C-alpha cells in the first residue's frame, strides 16, 4: 500500500493542517515509509503465538476490591467551622 500526494493533501485538509507543497512531499515519503513497515509486519507468521502485553510475563499486584469509607472523615471535616459527627453543618438557606 502506498499514498500519493493528493491523499496526503486531502488528509491534511481533513485534519485542518496547513501544509506547503514541500511539507506534503516530505510527509509523502514518511507516510509511505510507515506503511511499508506495516506491510512488513503483516508478512510475519504469528500462528500459535499468544497475544502479550509485556515482553516478560508480569503478574500485576492487585489490591483487594473492598468498599471502605476511606478512613478520612476526620481529616475532611477538620477545617469545617461546624460539624456534627462526620457531617458538615451549614446555615439553613431554605425557609
From Swiss-Prot:
Disulfide bonds: none annotated. Its EC number is 6.3.5.-. One of its GO terms (molecular function) is asparaginyl-tRNA synthase (glutamine-hydrolyzing) activity. It is an enzyme of class 6 (ligase). InterPro entries: Asp/Glu-ADT_sf_sub_c, GatC. The keyword DNA-binding does not apply. This is Aspartyl/glutamyl-tRNA(Asn/Gln) amidotransferase subunit C. It comes from Agrobacterium fabrum (strain C58 / ATCC 33970).
Amino acid at each position: 500500500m502506498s499514498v500519493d500526494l493528493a491523499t496526503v493533501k486531502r488528509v491534511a485538509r481533513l485534519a485542518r493542517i496547513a501544509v506547503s507543497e514541500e511539507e506534503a512531499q516530505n510527509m509523502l515519503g514518511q507516510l509511505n515509509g510507515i506503511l511499508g513497515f506495516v506491510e512488513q509486519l503483516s508478512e510475519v507468521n504469528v500462528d500459535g503465538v499468544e497475544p502479550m502485553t509485556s515482553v516478560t510475563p508480569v503478574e500485576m499486584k492487585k489490591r483487594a476490591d473492598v468498599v471502605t469509607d476511606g478512613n478520612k472523615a476526620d481529616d475532611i471535616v477538620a477545617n469545617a467551622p461546624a460539624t456534627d459527627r462526620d457531617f458538615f453543618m451549614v446555615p439553613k438557606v431554605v425557609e
